[in-house]
């Protein structure tokens, strides 16, 4: 059976943490930032975890992670 391929878009967007949760970047931080407050932009700065209901589909996209 051939090797499974990792989705290139998923490997650029997600990473697996040591505890098994999946790390992702925050959305809404690329452009149109002038109308957003400093507080909103500060909260969007850090990474967050993928929701547990979406984690299975993300893991299927990255079989060797």
UniProtKB/Swiss-Prot annotation:
In the record, biological process GO terms are: translation
Name the PROSITE patterns for this protein.
RIBOSOMAL_L35
Q: Which GO terms describe its cellular component?
A: cytosolic large ribosomal subunit
Gene Ontology molecular functions: structural constituent of ribosome
According to the record, the residues making up region (Disordered) are 1-21
Its keywords, alphabetically, are: Ribonucleoprotein, Ribosomal protein
Q: Which family does it belong to?
A: Belongs to the bacterial ribosomal protein bL35 family.
**What is the official name of this protein in its record?**
Large ribosomal subunit protein bL35
Source species of the chain: Dechloromonas aromatica (strain RCB)
